[in-house]
Regions:
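CBM-like, beta-strand-rich accessory domains located in the C-terminal region of large
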Residues: 2, 184, 343, 348-355, ...
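Extended, charge-enriched "interface" segments that sit outside catalytic cores
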Residues: 27-121, 128-132
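Beta-sandwich/jelly-roll carbohydrate-recognition scaffolds of carbohydrate-active enzymes
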Residues: 97, 102, 409-411, 419, ...
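Aromatic-lined, polymer-binding surfaces characteristic
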Residues: 110-112, 119-120, 124-324, 328, ...
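Residues that flank catalytic or metal-binding motifs in active/ligand-binding sites
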Residues: 134, 241, 417-419, 450-452, ...
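Carbohydrate-active enzyme catalytic cores, enriched for enzymes
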Residues: 282, 286-464, 516-519
Length: 658
């Protein structure tokens, strides 16, 4: 049973997932928060501050014209007051209210930050809507537009908004002082805003010569030093905190404790980059968007280290290299990675306009910094961020100055430590099989109950889709659905999830999966690729799944076996939003369009189950696809119901035509 975040039951369950060291650390945090309420820390005096962390000559000129054009178009939309966050269009950006949630119409209350119930949507509104604007990543876009065009309108808008934000958000007051990841990303944005505005006459007056700015920067850094994410929460949040802290202590190293914070942040960054990443290079949260977020943050931090001539531990570069190679390995033919686990559209550093491919941009940066492998997919798009980061980051050395690393000679398809396997076939057939751990750390905050699920695409089109995430706070019914077992392409027993949820970011019992067979190369040679795995998430039962992709027939076979006592079964297949389905009995005819061409497939479903098509249902939710955080649209879900007696398997065959 899931408890609402912040309820007594939730606190008990959350406490049960902590170790003694984490409990002690959090107790110390609570005491410090109480002490700071009556005796807040004070920013020391700063004199002679100068900003020297500028872009090298030629970095802006290296931006491709089409990338610059997209950036300026985006900046002009922002200047006109238009922006969209998580499916909500705003037209008030010319003079924003920093505490207002346009989705619910609520305004977050003022008060001591640690007393604001930011998880309570009835009191605060949708906290993600409020926080996103104050990451100030739209300001880095405006600042980049100034750097490229020299048009001072962009710089003046940035300055006006920063002064407005600083005036409205005094240190330790309001919702923008409650979450470390927000402070860390905001600091990184400020570093880049100052860098990109360096040619503007008012830049120094806005930052280093401005006591208000100095006070804000110092308090952000002091907060992050005092309240790091700990123990079971040391996931992508702690990396954002460390990256922002490190960037600020390098670029804004004007305070008496800057050198110590820089060393501490770099040590934390190195430790947690390693801890959050499998040796194969995949992110341990097994939530692909967070792989992208962590990689962006790591590259941005590395840029600050190299620019400031601060020696980063060699393992930092090594982990980022492995992450980049892993990303290149798992994307489909259209450079789309898996839709595994939670996704909230979070970015580390934004200097590009709409239409820039996030994953192509990361691979382009990886090429510039580490060098591409022959098997990497081609990246044809351009972006603003890559030439800027590449101007700051030293190329990966080939002279033995880093730990020995052997990069894959051919494209990896099976990541044993992460339990992720990609089967590839002709005509752009791509199948991701999940036999890995249930998320990261004891709470597995961003995991879904999706053991043994498959995700299938052809030429980048979702055919058997992972439905996505949609929401975090405020809509518990939808949060439960999108992370449920029924909400994925796998088997549900007894109307229960494979793993047990204790809250919206808390799992109290984790299904354990193991891969038994992984032979992904067969289909590439014209034969058959094979994968088999099982999990023990259902007590007294074991679910085993076999997947075979045969190149010659363009056929994907999925065989599900359930060993154990007789139980009710639901087998779900979620179709992508572009797929039209005509279900007759246990056969579904699928059709869609790609680049103006008609495509089709047939899905033969197990006849032992009774099949129904569901689309856009709300009570309970079923038949939905979330293309991005805060957005959902109806899509067809095929659900077969029946019973498993442990004797026979359920066989599904997907045949692609043309």
């Amino acid at each position: 049973m899931t408890a609402n975040a912040g309820s007594p039951a939730w606190y008990l369950r959350r406490l049960s997932r902590m170790g003694p060291r984490e409990v002690g650390g959090r107790a110390g945090d609570a005491l410090r928060r109480r002490r700071w309420r009556s005796a807040p820390p004070h920013c020391p005096a700063v004199t002679g501050a100068r900003f020297t962390a500028v872009l090298p000559a030629g970095a802006v000129a290296a931006v491709a014209p089409d990338a610059a054009k997209r950036l300026v178009a985006e900046a002009d939309r922002l200047m006109a007051g238009h922006v969209e966050y998580f499916g909500v269009v705003r037209d008030d950006l010319a003079d924003p209210d920093w505490w207002y949630d346009p989705k619910t119409g609520r305004r977050a209350p003022w008060g001591y930050a640690f007393g604001v119930p930011y998880r309570d949507e009835e009191v605060v509104g949708d906290i993600k809507q409020i926080w996103e604007l104050s990451r100030h990543q739209y300001l880095t876009v405006l600042a980049a537009a100034y750097a490229i065009t020299g048009d001072e309108r962009y710089a003046e808008r940035v300055a006006g908004h920063l002064r407005s934000w600083w005036a409205a958000n005094a240190p330790l007051h309001g919702v923008h002082w409650t979450s470390g990841i927000e402070l860390g990303i905001r600091l990184l944005s400020w570093v880049w805003v100052r860098r990109l505005l360096d040619g503007w006459p008012g830049a120094a007056e806005l930052f280093e010569d401005n006591p208000v700015a100095l006070n804000q920067i110092w308090h952000h850094q002091r907060w992050l030093a005092a309240f790091p994410s700990r123990g079971s929460s040391a996931n992508n949040h702690v990396i954002a905190e460390a990256a922002g802290q490190f960037a600020a202590s390098c670029a804004f190293g004007w305070f008496p404790f800057s050198a110590r914070l820089r060393a501490d942040a770099l040590r934390s960054l190195e430790r947690h980059l390693r801890g959050n990443t499998f040796r194969s290079g995949l992110n341990r949260e097994l939530a692909t968007e967070y792989h992208g977020l962590v990689l962006e943050l790591g590259l941005a931090a590395l840029a600050e280290a190299d620019l400031a001539d601060v020696p980063a531990p060699p393992t930092v570069r090594l982990v980022l290299l492995r992450m980049t190679d892993a990303l290149a390995a798992i994307v489909d033919d259209r450079l789309r990675p898996p839709r595994q686990g939670d996704a909230d559209d979070g970015h580390g550093l934004v200097v590009d306009g709409a239409g820039t491919d996030r994953w192509g941009s990361l691979l382009a940066t990886g090429d510039a910094v580490f060098g591409r492998r022959a098997w990497w997919p081609e990246v044809t798009g351009t972006d603003v961020r890559t030439p800027m980061l590449a101007a700051l980051i030293r190329p990966y050395p080939a002279d033995g100055a880093v730990p020995a690393v052997t990069r894959p000679a051919s494209r990896p398809a099976h990541f044993a430590d992460a339990g992720l396997t990609v089967l590839r076939g002709p005509a752009g057939i791509w199948c991701r099989c999940d036999g890995g751990p249930h998320g990261f750390l004891s709470i597995a905050a961003h995991a879904h109950a999706d053991a043994l699920s498959v995700e299938v695409r052809q030429d980048g089109v979702d055919v058997l889709a992972d439905p996505g995430t949609f929401c975090y706070h405020g809509q518990p019914v939808w949060r439960r659905y999108f992370r449920s077992t029924l909400g994925h392409n796998t088997v549900q027993l007894g109307d229960a999830d494979q793993s047990v949820s204790g809250g919206p970011f808390l799992w109290t019992r984790h299904a354990r999966s193991r891969v038994l067979v992984a032979d992904p190369s067969g289909a590439l040679d014209g034969g058959t690729a094979r994968w088999c795995a099982e999990h023990d998430g259902y007590q007294r039962s074991v679910h085993r799944r076999r997947v075979e992709l045969t190149a010659a027939s363009r056929e994907l076979k999925v065989v599900d076996e359930v060993r154990g006592p007789r139980r009710s079964v639901r087998l779900a297949f979620h179709l992508g939003p572009a797929i039209a389905a005509d279900l007759t009995g246990s056969r579904a005819a699928l059709s869609w369009t790609r680049d103006g061409a008609e495509r089709s497939a047939v899905l033969d479903l197990p006849g032992e189950l009774s099949w129904r098509a569901h689309r856009g249902e709300t009570d309970p939710p079923l038949g939905w696809y979330s293309p991005g955080f805060g957005r959902k649209e109806p899509a067809t879900t095929l659900v077969g119901t029946g019973f498993s007696d442990g004797a026979e398997g359920f066989t599904t065959v997907l045949r692609f035509h043309g």
